[in-house]
Amino acid sequence: MAYFLDFDERALKEWRKLGSTVREQLKKKLVEVLESPRIEANKLRGMPDCYKIKLRSSGYRLVYQVIDEKVVVFVISVGKRERSEVYSEAVKRIL
């Protein structure tokens, strides 16, 4: 079952600021995630139903939450991994 994609409005602003190559790389991974969103290796501890997509070469991370009741993959935060900012922003946004 394919999931739908939705963005937190702050995450959408972050998405729009990304360079085109980074955005294209994340798009490819998001297409895979929409088919099978619960990837255990990418599960985030301490954040219920949250997972990450990581681009190792550029250091970018995308944090998303799977909402089964609505069949939605909800993007919470997008950004560089530096000082774990992308993760701390995600925690603030889901609480």
Swiss-Prot record:
Listed result of changing residue 61 to A: Reduces mRNA cleavage rate constant 2700000-fold
InterPro entries, per database record: RelE/ParE_toxin, RelE/ParE_toxin_dom_sf
One example of a Gene Ontology biological process annotation: regulation of DNA-templated transcription
Sorted UniProt keywords: Antibiotic resistance, Endonuclease, Hydrolase, Nuclease, Repressor, RNA-binding, rRNA-binding, Stress response, Toxin-antitoxin system, Transcription, Transcription regulation
Catalytic residues in the record: 52, 81
EC assignment: 3.1.-.-
CC terms in the record's Gene Ontology section: protein-DNA complex; toxin-antitoxin complex
Induction section of the entry: By amino acid starvation, by glucose starvation and by chloramphenicol; induction is independent of ppGpp. Autorepressed by RelB, RelE acts as a corepressor. Member of the relBEF operon. Operon induced by ectopic expression of toxins HicA, HipA, MazF, MqsR and itself, but not by YafQ.
Keyword match RNA-binding: yes
Domain of life: Bacteria
Additional observations: There are estimated to be 550-1100 RelB and 50-100 RelE molecules in rapidly growing cells of MG1655; as they have quite high affinity for each other (dissociation constant of 0.33 nM) there is probably less than 1 free RelE molecule per cell. The RelB(2)-RelE complex has a half-life of over 70 minutes.
Function in brief: Toxic component of a type II toxin-antitoxin (TA) system. A sequence-specific, ribosome-dependent mRNA endoribonuclease that inhibits translation during amino acid starvation (the stringent response). In vitro acts by cleaving mRNA with high codon specificity in the ribosomal A site between positions 2 and 3. The stop codon UAG is cleaved at a fast rate while UAA and UGA are cleaved with intermediate and slow rates. In vitro mRNA cleavage can also occur in the ribosomal E site after peptide release from peptidyl-tRNA in the P site as well as on free 30S subunits. Seems to be a principal mediator of cell death in liquid media. Implicated in hydroxy radical-mediated cell death induced by hydroxyurea treatment.
Subunit organization: Forms an RelB(2)-RelE(2) heterotetramer. Also forms an RelB(2)-RelE heterotrimer. The RelB(2)-RelE complex is probably the one that binds DNA and represses transcription, possibly as 2 heterotrimers, 1 bound to each of 2 operators. RelE occupies the A site of the 70S ribosome, making extensive contacts with the 16S rRNA. Its presence blocks access of tRNAs and translation factors. RelB bound to RelE prevents RelE from entering the ribosomal A site and thus inhibits its endonuclease activity.
Protein name as it appears in the record: mRNA interferase toxin RelE
Lineage: Bacteria, Pseudomonadati, Pseudomonadota, Gammaproteobacteria, Enterobacterales
